[in-house]
Each structure stands twice: as structure tokens, then as C-alpha cells.
Amino acid sequence: MPSDRTHIIWDNSNIFISGRSVCDKLERKSAAFRINFESLVDLAANNRTIEQVFCVGSVPPPTDAVWGHIEKKTGKKPELYERGAESGKEQAVDQALQTRMLRLGYDFDPPETLVLLSGDGSGADQGVGFFSDIKRLHKFGWNIEVMSWKDHCNRAMRTWAEQNGLFVPLDDFYGSVTFLQGLRNAKPLDLSKRPAKV
């Protein structure tokens, strides 16, 4: 039986770029679109103990208050992997994150809960990528939760998460996990609306 500790694997570029597209449809102000990192972390944790956070993408600087928020909640500094501007699809950084994710299956016994903040299901037909790796961790007994924007999550990964773990659509929390710089503040996060695994 997995414990209540939560490990957050976060592909911020995927969440940000997809979220900006959602913003363009809802508010047509994508240039001002920002992620409210603290609310996103709180949504992922859902009042559970955060064991660790691994984040890749265009992330705030290590001194940013969001990382202090995570450190305060966990007692640990999150691991941040900045994507290089010239790395094309930046697959090497994704692979580094996936390696960290797979190590969880060996390093934690009993299994715990993994929250994947990404809708990237690429590579699954070759047995690689985030989708393949969450299935591997699930075989080890891990609880799996996928948080992504509905229309920007790989369809097969979303269906798998709904059937084998939990899918949390970020769209349902759009006003809380986003803000428009200089135009709209984030609303308070209401965790009572977050789906939970039964």
C-alpha cells in the first residue's frame, strides 16, 4: 500500500506553453499569462506531505519565492533543471527528469504517490517517455496522478490515468493556478474541488 508522501515531477515548459494556449482561448491575453507556482504546487500536493519536487523547464530563478514555498513545505530544496535555449526539443532534459522519476521506483519502499505535471505522452509507442515511465512505476505499486490541461494532454495517457490512477484537469483550476501579469490576480485555490483517488 503506497504511503501518503508525494513526489512531484514537473515539466514546466509543457504546463506553461499549453496553459498559454488555454489562456488565448479563454482570455485572449496570452502575452501576460503566468503560472501561479505556489497554487500549482499546493494543488499537486493536495495537503499531503511533499517528499521532493523535480522541475524542468523555464523556471523562476533559484532565489524565487516559489522555491522557498516548496522548501518550507518539504524542508528540502527542489531540484531544478533549466532548459537550454539552443537545445531544440530539449529531449535530454526530459530524459534526465525521467531517469529521476524511475529511480523513485527503486529508492522508495513502500511505494508512494507520484504527481506528474505534464501532458507529454511522446515516445510511448517506443516504450520511452513520461507515459511509459508512469506505467512502469504503477507496476511497482506507485499511485500515479497526472495533472495537465485537458486538451493538451496525450489522449492515451489521460485515459490511462483516469483508469489506473487519477487525472486532474488544470482547466478546472485555471483561475487559481494562473494569473495575467498586471491584469488579473490568481484566485484563492479551493482544494475541495480537486478529484481524489477512491
Which functions belong to the PLM regions below?
Residues 1-99, 138-152:
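Domain-level signal for Mg2+-assisted phosphodiester chemistry and nucleotide/NA-binding surfaces
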Residues 44, 104-108, 136-137:
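Hydrophobic helix-cap positions at the C-terminus of alpha-helices
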Residues 124-133, 137-140, 170-171:
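Acidic, low-complexity intrinsically disordered regions
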